[in-house]
Amino acid sequence: MLGLGLAACGTTDVQEEEPPQQQEQGLVLEAGCTQLAANVADHTCHHVNNGPALTVNASATENFAGTSPNINTTHTYYTVNLTGSGSSRVGTVKFKPAKKAADSVGTQYAWAFYRNNATPLVVKSEDGTSTISPVLTHSVAVSGCALTTVSVYNLTGNTTYQLVFGPTSSSSVGIGAERVEDLRNYYFQDADGDGYGNTNIYKLTACVPPANYVLDDTDCNDSNASVHPGAGC
């Protein structure tokens, strides 16, 4: 079986004789993605349940000066304490996604923000003059994990954004930010449906793979379901 849990984002459809290699490039969320794959939520849930974890007190106002409070540390689960009372609690923190050194200025990356409740989230530019729309939002359900929803945004590296929460009746929101491309997997075409994939035809994605693609790449005859490892290979 060949799969990468830490690679770059987007889907690559390639046919070749050599095993696929990890690709490193800044990539936005691929077109046609309707849901992130389970391993992305599982990764974030690991941090929810095992840390590292930090708590920050959100600013009561938007467009605040300085860099804090922020949730800039990736692979970290944050509890963001909101301000106000009743159903009018709000809060703002900053987020500055990293740019990989090899990428050019202005490179965008898909970032997934997993949260533990339905507190509204709006992503804005640092000065508050523009709002960034999510390219994907869907519910999350992982056994033993508090996460309930995820939204994905294409964000420019080394650029500061505001995350504006509320209004809500929740006193806090748990949130984990992950760069989607870091959590891609290789999936291999399983044309004969035997559960074993063709190592020469694959897709690299952090999204739910298309039908008839599997993580296993050990089929020696993908046109005959009776021939596979343990049965003729």
What are these regions (language model features)?
Residues 15-17, 27-57, 96-99, 125-134, ...:
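C-terminal edge strands of extracellular/lumenal beta-sandwich accessory domains
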Residues 40-85:
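Transition segment at domain starts
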Residues 118-146:
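Surface-exposed beta-strand/loop patches in noncatalytic accessory domains
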Residues 10-13:
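Bacterial signal peptide processing site
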